[in-house]
């Protein structure tokens, strides 16, 4: 059954499902005021908190670390509270604080997220917007054990000159890539989504390599990037009704391709694979359990089959309720007098076929197993609520 999480007093701006089936089903949420909450989804209560000085922009899970980027121009690395994952929650007045173990100043003027990858046991690499120019990127490395180890290895890296020399000027005309909108890591490649609609894949191995270029969303801005594990692709959304599908050719050699003083281009092909769906202005996109889930500026979330061809259902919050409707075709935009509530964050939780709950309570064990038998979509709204809805429609999916 759908349920609602209520604790935030302002708009929810970021959600992250803690992806570890050995832990109690857990959600991490952040809001406009900088509050971070760790939720037990069985008890439906928060059991840890942390407060930043600005709006939460994004979360990333990296092993047992929570990477939180906020509008106070700071990236914080917090320790996930693994010792208390089976607790039922604490009274509101006594929520314990998450442990802060590292923080880095970053540029969050344009609401772009960040991406952190692990280099070895204690060393990490950060990809983010340049501290002064959001159209260029910085790359840092640091040792998590040493608060003074932060070192910038690439500064104000611009990709425009290289990309503009590869495109056909008769079909694509642009004088810049624009602001960096999104970062995401998949299979060792860092994908950047730009205001111009380009998605570029980078890899740092004995120099910086461009391994993938796509104009699928050109000339509209990239609004979101997500990993489509069932597809083996990265998916991008934009203001139009096209989703970009991104798969680099990792076996491409660089010796016959383009290079500059900053980067080597391993694959100079401009890719444009995409799929069209019957909604536009897709601000949030997720792919889970052979489902494609898209949330639009209209306040409607639509569930598709994995290829985006068949509409299975839609989710809409109106006047404090969530309406589930098999017809997704509504207004393309949100009128001023609309009673729909704006979607401000989304994440999904996949099914787990085999779950071995680490708890002693038989009741908790049953709820744990039952929860993971469903696919869940969790949506954060501008009114501070978080709605959790099952999105398993196996009986409607055709081969």
UniProtKB/Swiss-Prot annotation:
Keyword Repeat: yes
Annotated GO biological process: chromatin organization
Gene3D superfamilies associated with the record: YVTN repeat-like/Quinoprotein amine dehydrogenase
Keyword Nucleus: yes
Record localization: Nucleus
InterPro entries reported in the protein's UniProt record: WD40/YVTN_repeat-like_dom_sf, WD40_repeat_dom_sf
Keywords in alphabetical order: Chromatin regulator, Nucleus, Repeat, WD repeat
Main location: nucleus
GO (cellular component) term, any one: nucleus
Source superkingdom: Eukaryota
Segments annotated as WD repeats: 7-49, 51-88, 101-141, 269-314
Subunit structure: Component of the ASTRA chromatin remodeling machinery complex.
Family to which the UniProt record says this protein belongs: Belongs to the WD repeat ASA1 family.
General function of this protein: Component of the ASTRA complex involved in chromatin remodeling.
Protein name: ASTRA-associated protein 1
Organism name: Kluyveromyces lactis (strain ATCC 8585 / CBS 2359 / DSM 70799 / NBRC 1267 / NRRL Y-1140 / WM37)
Taxonomy of the source species: Eukaryota, Fungi, Dikarya, Ascomycota, Saccharomycotina
Gene: ASA1
